[in-house]
Amino acid sequence: MQTELDYIKETLTKRIYILFIEKYKGNKLQFAKKVGCDEKAIRLIFDKNQGMTINLFFKIASALEIDPSELIKDLKINK
């Protein structure tokens, strides 16, 4: 199960990163301000594969102007 969770976190982070690059051209400070968090939090998510709270996840989705469900589409834990 942990392997699946790690895969989900990695995939979600990649999806967010791709949209971040498209919308914010790699400007982590601008993105962090729009999200409402520290730039350090954004760096940790992207560079260190740090997890995120559900609140931060929704703020990130809002800053990327995407429905949160689109970011997690097709991500699931197999039984």
Language model regions located:
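Short, charged recognition helix plus adjacent turn
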Residues: M1-Y7, L44, I72-K79
